[in-house]
Amino acid sequence: MASRNIWCVRRNFLFDLRGWMLQYSAEVFLKSISFRTFSVECDSKDKESLEEEREDLLSNLVTMGVDIDMARRRQPGVFNKAVTNEQELKIFLLSKGASDKVIGSIISRYPRAITRTPESLSKRWDLWRKIMASDLEIVNILERSPESFFRSNNNLNLENNIKFLCSVGLTHKCLCRLLTNAPRTFSNSLNLNKQMVEFLQETGMSLGHNDPRDFVRKIISKNPSILIQSTKRVKTNIEFLQSTFNLNKQDLLLLICGPGARILDLSNDCTKKNYTNIRERLLSLGCSEEEVQRFVLSYLNMVFLSEKKFNDKIDCLIEEKISASQIIENPRILDSSINTLKTRIRELSHAGYDLSTSSIALLSWSQRRYEAKLKRLCG
C-alpha cells in the first residue's frame, strides 16, 4: 500500500513537472517569436531609413553634377556608408575657390572624398598651404589628382612627411614641385619616404658623391616622382644604365645626377624593352654599337618612346631620304610628333630646302622659331 502511494506521488510529480516545462517552453517560444517580430520590425525600419539616406545621397550627388556611374565603378563602397559629408565638402571647396563643375569632377573620380570630415579637410588644407602659395594652386592639384588630397585623412603623417623632407634639405621650391607633380609623396608613410631617401644617400656615397644630402636634392629636383616608386625599381634602373653603357662610377654619377635621373622611375621592363628596340632598329640601318650608345646617352628621353612610336618616326624620316647618321647626330627630332615631322618636311621641300644635304635640326625647333625660318626660306 505504501509503495503504491509512493508511485502515485511520483507520477503526479512527473505530470506536474512536465506541465510546468511545457508551460515554460511555450512562454519562451512565444517570447522568442515576439522578440523576432520586433527585431524584424527594427531591421525593416533601419533598412527603410538607410534606403532613404542613400536616396538623399544620390539626390545630392546628382544635384552637384557627379557622374554616379563613374563614382560607383571607382569606389562602390562609399554608397554603403552610413554617414557622408557631401554637402560639407561642397561648402568647403567652394570657400577655397573651386567651381561647381570642378567639385562634381573631383567626387566623380574620387568618391571617398565625401567621407572626410570638415575638421580633417581644414587641417589638411592648412598643411598644404604651408607649401603652396594660394588656395587656387591646391584646387588645381585636386582637379588633376583628387586622390592626392583625399586618399588619406592621416594629417599627422602628412605633417611628419613635410618636416622630414625639409630636414633632408629640400627647398620650398622643391616641395612645391613635389606637391604639384607627385602629390602622392605626401600620402606615403613616413617610413617609405625615409627608405627611399636613405637608399639614395647610400647610392650617392657608393658612387663617390661627397654630400649625400646634395645628391638626394639633385635627384628629387630632376625627378619629383622618384619618391613614389620602389627602391627596387630605382636600383634596377641604375644597374641597367651602368651595365648597358659600361659606365664607371664617376660617369654613372654624372648621368643620374643629370639626364639619367628622369628614367630612374621608369618600369624596368619598359626601360629594357625600349632600349632593345632602339638598338636593334639602328643596327638594322647600319649603325655601330658605339653610335647606338652615343645616340641614347646624348638624349636619354629616347628610352621613353614605345617600340611603335620610335619605329614609326624612324620610318617616316628614312622615307624622306634622311639618313641614319643624320638622325644619330640630331636625336631631339624624335621628340616631334609624326604629323609635325611630315608637315615640316613637306613645307621645307616646297621651300626648296634639301633635308638630305642640310641640317635637320629645325625639325625639332619650337613652332615660333621654325615659322620664322620657313618665312625666310620662302623669301
UniProtKB/Swiss-Prot annotation:
One MF term from GO for this chain? double-stranded DNA binding
Q: What is its main location?
A: mitochondrion
Transit peptide located at 1-37
* Modification comment: Phosphoprotein with mostly four phosphate groups. While the DNA-binding activity is unaffected by the phosphorylation state, only the phosphorylated form of the protein is active for termination activity. Functioning seems to be regulated by phosphorylation.
Q: Name one Pfam family in it.
A: mTERF
List the InterPro entries.
MTERF (IPR003690), MTERF_sf (IPR038538)
Tissues in which the UniProt entry reports expression: Expressed strongly in the heart and at lower levels in brain, liver and kidney.
Knockout mutant characteristics: Double knockout of Mterf1a and Mterf1b results in viable animals with no gross phenotype, and normal oxidative phosphorylation capacity. Steady-state mitochondrial DNA levels are normal. There are subtle effects on levels of mitochondrial transcripts: transcripts initiated at the light strand promoter and also situated downstream of the MTERF binding site are increased, levels of 7S RNA are reduced, while levels of other mitochondrial transcripts appear normal.
**Disulfide pattern:** none
Superkingdom = Eukaryota
- Which GO terms of type biological process are on file? DNA-templated transcription termination; regulation of DNA-templated transcription; transcription initiation at mitochondrial promoter
| Gene3D superfamilies, A to Z | Transcription termination factor 3, mitochondrial (1.25.70.10)
The compartments listed are: Mitochondrion
- For the site labelled Interaction with DNA, the residues are 144, 184, 332
**Which keywords belong to this entry?**
DNA-binding, Mitochondrion, Phosphoprotein, Repeat, Transcription, Transcription regulation, Transcription termination, Transit peptide
Instruction: List the GO cellular component terms.
Output: mitochondrion
What is the annotated quaternary arrangement, including any partners?
A: Monomer.
The entry's family comment says: Belongs to the mTERF family.
Job description of the protein: Transcription termination factor. Binds to a 28 bp region within the tRNA(Leu(uur)) gene at a position immediately adjacent to and downstream of the 16S rRNA gene; this region comprises a tridecamer sequence critical for directing accurate termination. Binds DNA along the major grove and promotes DNA bending and partial unwinding. Promotes base flipping. Transcription termination activity appears to be polarized with highest specificity for transcripts initiated on the light strand.
PANTHER family, per the entry: TRANSCRIPTION TERMINATION FACTOR 1, MITOCHONDRIAL, TRANSCRIPTION TERMINATION FACTOR, MITOCHONDRIAL
- Its protein name is Transcription termination factor 1b, mitochondrial
Q: Name the species this protein comes from.
A: Mus musculus
